Amino acid sequence: MVSPTKMIIRSPLKETDTNLKHNNGIAASTTAAGHLNVFSNDNNCNNNNTTESFPKKRSLERLELQQQQHLHEKKRARIERARSIEGAVQVSKGTGLKNVEPRVTPKELLEWQTNWKKIMKRDSRIYFDITDDVEMNTYNKSKMDKRRDLLKRGFLTLGAQITQFFDTTVTIVITRRSVENIYLLKDTDILSRAKKNYMKVWSYEKAARFLKNLDVDLDHLSKTKSASLAAPTLSNLLHNEKLYGPTDRDPRTKRDDIHYFKYPHVYLYDLWQTWAPIITLEWKPQELTNLDELPYPILKIGSFGRCPFIGDRNYDESSYKRVVKRYSRDKANKKYALQLRALFQYHADTLLNTSSVNDQTKNLIFIPHTCNDSTKSFKKWMQEKAKNFEKTELKKTDDSAVQDVRNEHADQTDEKNSILLNETETKEPPLKEEKENKQSIAEESNKYPQRKELAATPKLNHPVLATFARQETEEVPDDLCTLKTKSRQAFEIKASGAHQSNDVATSFGNGLGPTRASVMSKNMKSLSRLMVDRKLGVKQTNGNNKNYTATIATTAETSKENRHRLDFNALKKDEAPSKETGKDSAVHLETNRKPQNFPKVATKSVSADSKVHNDIKITTTESPTASKKSTSTNVTLHFNAQTAQTAQPVKKETVKNSGYCENCRVKYESLEQHIVSEKHLSFAENDLNFEAIDSLIENLRFQI
């Protein structure tokens, strides 16, 4: 009860009741004290004239006045708190002193009832919370269920809609739980969500009081079997017909405008029923017979790096290596995996405090699947290994038993075996003769020079791409980044979209050849300058006096150490033995050469005087006995014996090939003379000048 001092209307010009109350008491005491003081003074002054009865009489009168004041305060009307439907109404001092009037006038009550009845018919959707309190027993639960049905019938008489599901269109939530501590509930709780969405949350007592104020007699409804429903409106009829079909037919029969799913299906729809269903798919059983060609994606087995919805048919999940690897991994992570399952399972909250894994796995839900269980697969392999071991042991015992039987019967069959051995010795050649024949063949073969056999081609470290053979990936690390990638192409790649209009752009035939950059980079350009192509030209002169010039070109292996050159002086030395045969002599020069791809050696020109009759014939023949890789070139030079002695050696005409040396940064007239000069040799012998190209070669060799 609120104290009277807080409810009284105060004025700054008037005393309040509280002040009066305290002041009156103080005044009474002061007056009494004053009278006593007066009495004492009078007594002191008129000690002889007064009597004892006078002060007693006046003190009794004052005591009576005090008692009357106390009785007046008790009879004062207390300030009361009046309640109405809108809320608490504070009654002032003036109204409190008067007789208590009705809280709400009949006119206000009628307006309130008509407004709420309109609201109930128009847009009220009521949801009854089915969650019970933990402490509620079975008797109270059945009692609350009956009361819930009674409240539903009461709201139906007002024309309100009762929804079976909670959604955002609900306006009132009626629950049997306590409404005081809603903020302590979880965010997913219905009461908490209703409070956040500004819905009304009522208890059963408040709902019953609300219906009573709307003149709904719940006692009468509890006695009658069926509730008197409100008059149906057109909107309600259309809504019910849309949901349940027309009223002139059986609602339990199938409807033509509704598709009923019979087989496995996917139905994705809007929970608020605002939008039409997004996905509706259904598959018949005949469409699901082939597991490899299912109409919907499923997880398939495959190696790492593969899409799990595509899988790999060549992937053997039941192989021994994979089973052992998977079993060891699952065994090591079993405890942690079960703890994760217990954490993420909604009804396993009570199992988190348990220490043993067996207690946690009791109430866990495992989804059935068709994948291979590592434990079962490992046990199968162990059983097969045990069977194979038993078979090998039995085979060994059988072999030993057979050997024992043979040894037992060996003595009995000695004569027969000796006869059979004699017959075989007569038919087959002796072993000694075979050994002698093999030794003789080996000695004869050692006499002839044997050709060295070529080394076997090394096996490739990587599989051949043409076969696309699957390799075992168990021993390969899972980190694919550790593998070496293929080396880059030796030339620069042409930029995307670049195409020249000159002849270079169309010089690749059908256009399928590799494209190269038309503009060389600075690094490649500087490296190409260090290379010099030694292309020596050949001058051919025709004289008036029948001068013949012959060009002899032979290919040989060129290196820094030795170069084979065909010189005219070498031919002149072989001229002496040919004089004895006659006037005309022939010098035969045979050279065996291998057709290797090396640059041609500088050709030599041989010129003879007009007085000397020389015939030079060059014939190249291939001997049938020679190998395919070698050819014999017969150079026959016919000289006149009389003029051979007087013939002078012809001077070589030096071919001047001028240019610019990028290394020495010097112009030269002859390349042959420049490469022998001291300046060029000092540059060529310094290894620091070739450090860049050496590193490039090492990198290319490493990638190959």
From Swiss-Prot:
Modified residues (Phosphoserine): S59, S84, S235, S623
Consequence the record notes for mutating C664A: In DBF4-AAHH; weakens interaction with ARS1 origin DNA and MCM2, but not other known ligands
GO molecular function: DNA replication origin binding; protein serine/threonine kinase activator activity; zinc ion binding
Zinc finger (DBF4-type): 654-703
Inducing factors: Cell cycle-regulated. Protein levels increase as cells begin S phase and remain high through late mitosis.
PROSITE patterns per record: ZF_DBF4
Binding site for Zn(2+): C661, C664, H674, H680
Span list, region D box 2: 62-70
Protein name: DDK kinase regulatory subunit DBF4
Gene name linked to the record: DBF4
